[in-house]
Design a protein with these regions (language model features):
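Active-site environment of divalent metal-dependent phosphoester hydrolases
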Residues: 12-15, 41-53, 110-113, 160-166, ...
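Short, flexible loop/turn elements at secondary-structure junctions
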Residues: 92-94, 106-109, 162, 221, ...
């Protein structure tokens, strides 16, 4: 590929030192780095699970990965919630400016224990995008449009799903039957699997409404719910999942545990209106990778020159 993104949960809480945390990330990114593929990452809810022990938080991870020659992460927008919120622009084949935009968003980790003395029992207890992140997107999107004398089409990536992902599967806020899903398939052109509940935060961030208003983002894709692979056309914006690429996270269980290990491929074509030409799934099985393997401890990969 011309670019690769790891969309959160790059590592889990296993590292017991800063060195182990760096080694874990290095093991993930070396295949891209060694092939000279530009790459970036977003953060998921598990990337800081070992921070209390290792001292490595998201800001430290950004500083670390920026040492890699082919990494394109930046420190991100200043003064807003999260780490590494940024927009990467792709130049057109002819001329200057931005031909396409890749929005990388930090969807956070977990909801706090309480707000106003009330806990989150009975509600999804993951994190959510904050109003300052939504405002940053709106302002940055408008600035891109001014500089380019027209909207810049793009895709957005964050780890934790929006509430609208859940709505799309059933074409409903409340109804959740097989008949509702059948209606949703026809209405929203749904493709792929849903093997677990969507796990958004307890509050709707309003980011989908903001992107719908701006009209530039053609799709928003997430991870988090590792065994979902579906994509839906939800009122003109694709909402979808990419499957877990690594074999260490939970899978389907049993003989099919690793069946959905894979990645999502996105195609851009300047000859297509809006540049975005579609997406498809690629699974490990498609490449003859052994799906029966278990977790196999091994020596960590060496750091490239200039990375420590």
């Amino acid at each position: 590929p011309d670019f690769a993104l790891i969309n959160g949960d790059v590592i889990d809480g296993s590292p017991t030192s800063a060195l182990e945390a760096k080694q874990a990330i290095n093991n993930v990114v070396r295949p891209m780095e060694d092939r000279g593929i530009p790459w970036a990452l977003t953060f998921g809810n598990h990337d800081e699970d070992s921070s209390a022990v290792t001292g490595m938080d998201e800001s430290a991870y950004v500083d670390f990965v920026r040492q890699y020659r082919h990494n394109v992460n930046t420190p991100g927008a200043r003064g807003i919630t999260g780490t590494g919120n940024q927009v990467l622009t792709v130049r057109p084949s002819r001329g200057a400016g931005a031909g396409f935009a890749l929005w990388l968003l930090d969807s956070g980790r977990y909801a706090p224990e309480q707000i106003a003395g009330q806990d989150f029992e009975g509600y999804p207890d993951w994190d959510w995008l904050r109003p300052d992140q939504v405002q940053w997107y709106l302002e940055t999107s408008a600035a891109l449009e001014r500089r380019n004398r027209g909207p810049v089409p793009g895709l957005a990536f964050q780890h934790i799903a929006l509430w609208e992902h859940r709505f799309a599967w059933f074409a409903s806020v409340d109804a959740r039957t097989e008949e509702d899903h059948a209606r949703a398939v026809a209405k929203h052109s749904i493709e792929g699997e849903r093997n677990e509940e969507e796990c958004p935060g307890p509050f709707n961030s309003g980011m989908f409404a903001a992107m719908l208003h701006r009209g530039d983002v053609k799709g928003l894709f997430v991870g988090h719910d590792h065994i979902n692979t579906y994509v839906a056309d939800y009122y003109g914006i694709q909402l979808g999942y990419a499957p877990g690429a690594g074999f260490g996270a939970y899978g389907l269980g049993g003989a099919e545990d690793h069946r959905l290990r894979g990645a999502r491929v996105f195609r851009l074509d300047e000859g297509v209106d809006g540049v975005y030409a579609g997406t498809e799934l690629r699974f490990a099985a498609d490449y003859g990778i052994d799906l029966t393997v278990g977790v196999q401890p091994g020596e960590p990969a060496d750091f490239p020159d200039g990375v420590s």
